[in-house]
């Protein structure tokens, strides 16, 4: 019996809409990464990008457990000596709420060219409106 490898004509990408209102950040990111990779499909192959497009709205109302609002830190470097900058989750949620979810999902995807292509299929918006009405995304209710 030969191993099945999906061909381009077998691959279909659907659009899904996820509401992040009162969802927990890590659990939501894990489920989104699972769908972006295409692991929910029976024709999954690790070397092919057959995942779906995910549109996430209400990202500003995302929740975290414990004291992560004040204790979790995000680091970035300016490229100069002594240029390590740090921000807390609370300040990042106030300034750029979409970046919090993108950063969490990016850490759960492969760190290669395929992972970068999968991340481009994630569309995150802070408020309830999005600009992908023409794609007719299907509302997706995630279990937790």
UniProtKB/Swiss-Prot annotation:
Q: Any idea which UniProt keywords this protein has?
A: Ribonucleoprotein, Ribosomal protein
Q: Which GO terms describe its biological process?
A: negative regulation of translation; translation
Q: Does the keyword Ribosomal protein apply?
A: yes
Which GO MF term does the entry hold, naming one? mRNA binding
Any one GO CC term of the record: cytosolic large ribosomal subunit
Domain of life the protein comes from: Bacteria
Which residues lie in coiled coils?
Answer: none
InterPro entries annotated for this entry?
Ribosomal_uL13, Ribosomal_uL13_bac-type, Ribosomal_uL13_CS, Ribosomal_uL13_sf
Q: Does the keyword Isomerase apply?
A: no
Quote the subunit structure annotation.
Part of the 50S ribosomal subunit.
The record's annotation in HAMAP family points to: Ribosomal_uL13
Family per similarity comment:
Belongs to the universal ribosomal protein uL13 family.
Q: What does this protein do?
A: This protein is one of the early assembly proteins of the 50S ribosomal subunit, although it is not seen to bind rRNA by itself. It is important during the early stages of 50S assembly.
According to UniProt, the name of this protein is Large ribosomal subunit protein uL13
Protein's gene? rplM
